[in-house]
A protein has these predicted regions:
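Bacterial Sec-dependent N-terminal signal peptides
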Residues: 1-25, 228
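Sec-dependent signal peptide cleavage junction
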Residues: 17-51
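N-terminal ordered "arm"
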Residues: 46, 50-64
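Aromatic-patch recognition
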Residues: 58-59, 63-189
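Long, compositionally biased interface segments
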Residues: 189-192, 198-236
Length: 236
């Protein structure tokens, strides 16, 4: 079973200048580490031996990122990547560290992550961490926010049944979902089908339909979706 590192933010009573220096020079020391076993139904998938297409990651490579605790930067230029299949944020102490030695960041609503231009937050479910998940923040509006949930479907490898057929490799496929976040914090899933799309924008269905037609927007295009939600936010 793969071992993961659970990260807990350490509290240091030091000046701001000292804190900044520590962040740049000794980032990993801001995090106390201990091991625990992560139990998921995908825990035994070995990507090194598996014949597959697609990827469980939104980006297979580790990219330079930042970790924030209560909106305060605690780790900068740290190698990060998001495993959407098991909903884990992975990190390494350095880019020279083998990927096999990567660790999982503690899931906490107090910890946010930035990977490149993408900002991820952890949202608990009914007050609990276990069933909560990571979301990418696409828009922060005055009244409404737009979050993206990355979902990966895993289809196991299928061995050839006869000599006339071939093995079908396992595959990871993307199935993202988008959520409108209301002022009270409630998540409303935005339908992907055109006939139901406007139902997410309660009270402004006609205005949203007109805005889409006038601007020739594609609801399946993420940039257009951001425009739509931003417009909805502006007319409420």
């Amino acid at each position: 079973m793969k071992k993961y590192l659970l990260l807990i933010v350490s509290v240091f009573i030091i000046s701001e200048s000292q804190a900044q220096h520590q962040q740049l020079q000794q980032q990993v020391q801001y995090l106390m580490q201990y091991q625990f076993d992560k139990t998921t139904k995908y825990e035994d998938i070995n990507l090194e031996t598996l014949n597959y297409t697609g990827s469980p990651y939104i980006n297979s490579s580790f990219l330079a990122g930042e970790i924030y605790h209560n909106n305060k930067l605690i780790a900068d230029n740290i190698p990060l990547r998001y495993n959407a299949l098991v909903d884990e944020m992975e990190f390494k102490p350095s880019f020279g560290t083998p990927d096999s030695e990567s660790s999982a960041l503690m899931k906490s609503p107090e910890i946010d992550v930035r990977i490149g231009s993408k900002v991820f937050i952890f949202v608990p479910y009914q007050g609990g961490i276990e069933k909560g998940g990571y979301f990418e923040v696409l828009l922060r509006g005055e009244k409404f926010d737009l979050f993206k949930k990355y979902n990966k479907r895993f289809t196991p490898e299928q061995k050839a049944q006869t000599s006339m057929t071939r093995d079908v490799p396992a595959r990871f496929t993307d199935n993202p979902m988008y959520y409108l976040i209301l002022e009270n914090g409630r998540f409303v899933e935005i339908p992907s089908r055109a006939r139901n799309f406007e139902s997410a924008f309660v009270g402004k269905e006609n205005e949203i339909r007109s805005f889409i037609r006038t601007n020739r927007l594609d609801i399946k295009n993420e940039a257009d979706l951001i425009r739509i939600v931003n417009h909805y936010d502006s007319i409420n």
